[in-house]
Amino acid sequence: CNEPGQQDQGNVGTSAIDAILKYEQTFIDAVRATGGNNASRCLIVQGPYTNIDKTVNDYTMPKDEVPDRLMVEVHFYDPYQFTMMNHDETWGKVFLYWGKDNHVSGSIHNATGYEEDYVKQQFQKMKTAYADKGIPVIVGEYSAMKRTKEDKIEGTSELAYPDIDREMHNKSRAYWNEVVTREAKKHGCVPFYWETGGDMNRGTGTAKEAYAIEGIMKGAAAGKYPY
């Protein structure tokens, strides 16, 4: 089960979290019971819909009879308007530009918060709640979708971003990759980039969007694990 509770985020209350814990406890017990390498291998459990705040505030790690062999996983797709939102809504605009030096003057698509300091604060929460207590943390997914001038609003022929400044958008994606990678590592969390063929050619192993990969590598070099 990936991102448990994801289909009903607005209603992930105590009963739902209890169900997630029961499911994960069953998983752990079943794996350990098979013996062999499974008796001691590292296992990964996910916090409620892999959300940092839910995992920090509402989640308790399941029990494992084997000490120091459980890891916790979260995902990072914040802010949603920058990483996943694909067209403007009545409640808000798509963020095409992210980071203090990447805003476009006069644009309605600049990020309004949830930038560098927010990323640091979120990973600090995971460090305090888990990594500092000896519980390994992985960021099992993180990425921000690519937008182009040719993108259309889903189900229509209308252009979604006709006025996009592609250079600044690319810089924003690269910088987001850099900041998230760096801050995850600095706060003791191991990041795994979610790549489905948009940034890499899986057939040749070459970069399709070199700037995005360069952002990851820059963040990886700058981020030093604290342990």
Positions of predicted regions on the chain:
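Active-site region of glycoside hydrolase catalytic domains
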Residues: 1-115, 124-145, 186-189
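Aromatic-rich peripheral "rim/lid" segments of glycoside hydrolase catalytic domains that contact
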Residues: 64, 149-227
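Well-ordered, non-membrane alpha-helical segments in soluble/globular domains
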Residues: 20-26, 119-120, 170-178
